[in-house]
Amino acid sequence: MAPLGGAPRLVLLFSGKRKSGKDFVTEALQSRLGADVCAVLRLSGPLKEQYAQEHGLNFQRLLDTSTYKEAFRKDMIRWGEEKRQADPGFFCRKIVEGISQPIWLVSDTRRVSDIQWFREAYGAVTQTVRVVALEQSRQQRGWVFTPGVDDAESECGLDNFGDFDWVIENHGVEQRLEEQLENLIEFIRSRL
């Protein structure tokens, strides 16, 4: 049962800690595959849009990496959890509306319920990708541990998930990352 989007050939659900490089990896894949073939979907997009509307905030500023977003992050996490508890598929359904590309990269999968929703909706074409980075690498990218954020379910919900289909190591070694991206791209192309 494919809700409201097209029927994708492949759905890759990316997860990882803040500053692990999830967006970097998904954007690199999209730039190599082409935006006509590959859509990057962000579960946080509809969350931030709805949160901004309900709280009278600037939606565009919530999308960037500014201190503006950070000022609201804890409350946004709390608010998003309340929405998900009421309807676990709420944000998942929103991001697939009208998507026509055959390859979907969900750049910010954070919970087991997100994975379950996509597996139920799209079955065998759904795979999980964990992006990992050493704490030192994340710190070099600007990460600082924030209580109430880095220890919340939105950051830790998939820590013990177990068997990811793919693990991308993004420790700052460009050649190693490139090899992993090439392997993933080869797999993606085999699904087209």
UniProtKB/Swiss-Prot annotation:
<dbReference type="Pfam" id="PF04275">
    <property type="entry name" value="P-mevalo_kinase"/>
</dbReference>
<feature type="binding site">
    <location>
        <begin position="17"/>
        <end position="23"/>
    </location>
    <ligand>
        <name>ATP</name>
    </ligand>
</feature>
<dbReference type="GO" id="GO:0016126">
    <property type="term" value="P:sterol biosynthetic process"/>
</dbReference>
<comment type="subunit">
    <text>Monomer.</text>
</comment>
<dbReference type="GO" id="GO:0006695">
    <property type="term" value="P:cholesterol biosynthetic process"/>
</dbReference>
<keyword id="KW-0443">Lipid metabolism</keyword>
<feature type="binding site">
    <location>
        <position position="170"/>
    </location>
    <ligand>
        <name>substrate</name>
    </ligand>
</feature>
<dbReference type="GO" id="GO:0005777">
    <property type="term" value="C:peroxisome"/>
</dbReference>
<comment type="pathway">
    <text>Isoprenoid biosynthesis; isopentenyl diphosphate biosynthesis via mevalonate pathway; isopentenyl diphosphate from (R)-mevalonate: step 2/3.</text>
</comment>
<keyword id="KW-0418">Kinase</keyword>
<dbReference type="GO" id="GO:0004631">
    <property type="term" value="F:phosphomevalonate kinase activity"/>
</dbReference>
<keyword id="KW-0753">Steroid metabolism</keyword>
<dbReference type="GO" id="GO:0019287">
    <property type="term" value="P:isopentenyl diphosphate biosynthetic process, mevalonate pathway"/>
</dbReference>
<feature type="binding site">
    <location>
        <position position="171"/>
    </location>
    <ligand>
        <name>ATP</name>
    </ligand>
</feature>
<keyword id="KW-0152">Cholesterol biosynthesis</keyword>
<feature type="binding site">
    <location>
        <position position="141"/>
    </location>
    <ligand>
        <name>ATP</name>
    </ligand>
</feature>
<keyword id="KW-0153">Cholesterol metabolism</keyword>
<dbReference type="GO" id="GO:0070723">
    <property type="term" value="P:response to cholesterol"/>
</dbReference>
<feature type="binding site">
    <location>
        <position position="180"/>
    </location>
    <ligand>
        <name>ATP</name>
    </ligand>
</feature>
<dbReference type="GO" id="GO:0016020">
    <property type="term" value="C:membrane"/>
</dbReference>
<keyword id="KW-0808">Transferase</keyword>
<comment type="function">
    <text>Catalyzes the reversible ATP-dependent phosphorylation of mevalonate 5-phosphate to produce mevalonate diphosphate and ADP, a key step in the mevalonic acid mediated biosynthesis of isopentenyl diphosphate and other polyisoprenoid metabolites.</text>
</comment>
<dbReference type="InterPro" id="IPR005919">
    <property type="entry name" value="Pmev_kin_anim"/>
</dbReference>
<keyword id="KW-0963">Cytoplasm</keyword>
<feature type="binding site">
    <location>
        <position position="176"/>
    </location>
    <ligand>
        <name>ATP</name>
    </ligand>
</feature>
<dbReference type="GO" id="GO:0005524">
    <property type="term" value="F:ATP binding"/>
</dbReference>
<keyword id="KW-0752">Steroid biosynthesis</keyword>
<keyword id="KW-0756">Sterol biosynthesis</keyword>
<dbReference type="InterPro" id="IPR027417">
    <property type="entry name" value="P-loop_NTPase"/>
</dbReference>
<keyword id="KW-0547">Nucleotide-binding</keyword>
<keyword id="KW-0225">Disease variant</keyword>
<keyword id="KW-1207">Sterol metabolism</keyword>
<dbReference type="GO" id="GO:0005829">
    <property type="term" value="C:cytosol"/>
</dbReference>
<keyword id="KW-0444">Lipid biosynthesis</keyword>
<protein>
    <recommendedName>
        <fullName>Phosphomevalonate kinase</fullName>
        <ecNumber>2.7.4.2</ecNumber>
    </recommendedName>
</protein>
<keyword id="KW-0067">ATP-binding</keyword>
<dbReference type="GO" id="GO:0070062">
    <property type="term" value="C:extracellular exosome"/>
</dbReference>
